[in-house]
């Protein structure tokens, strides 16, 4: 008996492409072509086409495609991540995962050029900016950048534009390796002289445009950046601090310490590891630098009736207006992940985030007190330990289900995250040959100024409240869950639900980027 094709398979193309054969023919007739192949032949030069035929593989249905993805996911061994290096274990609250990350009302909305159809996202992004501003102690924050390394690179560009006479930039040797690499390359690309230095030594010479300081360092160590900030200011330069937003719940803000710019990643505010991205970076600056800052900036205005309304501000910085003289490109953003991070802060509030930070720090302190060879006295969540053979320790812990960082042949880094437990500390201590002991706080520069004081961070802490808030915001937006958007194409609008559903599977979402 001849069977009809699987309905799921036969309809996959039609479900996700849109036009059917008759609609396609209407468009071809209007353009004067007999077929889609004829249109492509006319539009695409022959010399740039792929030679030969594509592999002849059978099409998969949605169900079959997900089953195939499941086989790929099952091949990943997900170790519990204690690796660090700018990527931290975090817990995404289910209400945020389901109603932001996996919700087409949020992930198919277009770049918010038009405030009339973007009020929900603009409010959520303003929450992100408020969060970053309060944590960093600097008055102006943007609505996200692409990642921590490129944010540091953007900070170098900002310092160079603001201090045109300075042609030297100093990079802290304690920056994460990937941040150091990207930042140095960006500096060289704009003809700056790059010096990678141990900032515990005194700065030598003049002609600086700025310095980039790690706070904390890649080994977790926390040092007071004020002497370096003061020294660069005395030489007419600017100070950028690369920091950790969760650490800033417990250590003093860069702005309070005198920094001009602060950058970092908001990943550990509820955004999964995702094997390295996408994650929303942030930048905050002093008021004097706001017109040089890259990235979207959400501001509060009034509508035609005089009511408060949100819109993108200072757009004369943007490439679509200023062209080659622009200091920003509006597409250099991670809006969905910034919304996720902001909602994580709203959901937990200052008290909840402080508890999370204190617990993580406490576990790190207990671990540090239980092993020999700890390299630094002050730290937040990461402990660097000197050992005889770092790779042997890493392998032993991998066999036990843990991923830790071989900083060098004789140093292992252990970075605690939100899901870490006392039982994890016990197993880690055992692998290092230590014995359990209680630690004491070792922050180095404890925070004395309040943070997250805006009422939005103290009003929405139950799942019902958050669910309703997210719905209220998405109802103020226009996305593909309501209608077609007659604008550009740089969104995830073509991603089928069956594809988006898989990105939060633990076997994909919880893999650290430096996992073997």
Predicted regions and their residues:
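Charged, compositionally biased N-terminal leader segments and the immediate start
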Residues: 1-19
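N-terminal entrance/gating region of PLP-dependent enzymes' catalytic architecture
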Residues: 19, 42-127, 321, 444-516
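A glycine-rich phosphate-binding loop feature that marks nucleotide/adenosyl-phosphate handling sites
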Residues: 85-91, 146-150, 173, 200-201, ...
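PLP-dependent aspartate aminotransferase-fold enzymes
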Residues: 90-106, 110-207, 493-516
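Conserved PLP-enzyme active-site core in the AAT-like
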Residues: 150-309, 370-371, 380, 384-387, ...
